[in-house]
Amino acid sequence: MPLFSTAFRKDVMDYIVSFAQQNEHIVALVAVGSGSYGYIDELSDLDMVIAIDSDENLRAVMDYVSSQLYKRLNFIYFKQVPERRLHVYLTDNYLEIDIGYGAYTSAAAFRKNWKVLFDKSGTVDQAMRISWERIKANTSDGQIAECADAVWHNLMH
């Protein structure tokens, strides 16, 4: 199977936005990393956070997202990291999809690159902006966040 194309990556992202908006427990979807501003290159992966209405619905939402992805895509790798509330998928054409989960009331930006794709509550974008401004205000925290972002990118690619 050949490598994924940028058109395929866009189709997958559009599909995720579509099915996420339909779920009553998914409050917001946030693109993080390079996908929030247009991707680094044609091989960039999809990184996102799904904000849910409450932690009690975490398992149901994770199962829903996984089932929707498996309906349309073929995966050669899947890893669930429960303690980090993270799913990592690798499609058969090598598109990596990383999805984190958390309650929308805990929305916070820990890296500078993020974009709210939809927000049913109208509060996530502001919470992300406020939290990022706090990190930027403390230079050492901002530098730590930048280093963490670089380390994350190098580990995942």
Predicted regions mapped to residue ranges:
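Conserved NTP/Mg2+-binding pocket subregion across the NTase superfamily
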Residues: 1-5, 66-157
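Catalytic metal-binding acidic patch
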Residues: 33-65
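Short alpha-helical segments and helix-capping/turn motifs at coil-helix boundaries
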Residues: 14-15, 32-35, 82-85
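Residue-level signal for beta-strand positions within conserved beta-sheet cores that form or flank
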Residues: 25, 44, 95
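Helical scaffold of the NTase/Pol beta-like nucleotidyltransferase catalytic core
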Residues: 1-30
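Short, conserved beta-strand segments within well-ordered enzyme catalytic domains
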Residues: 28-30, 49-51, 100
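Short secondary-structure boundary/capping segments within folded domains
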Residues: 19-22, 38-42, 88-89
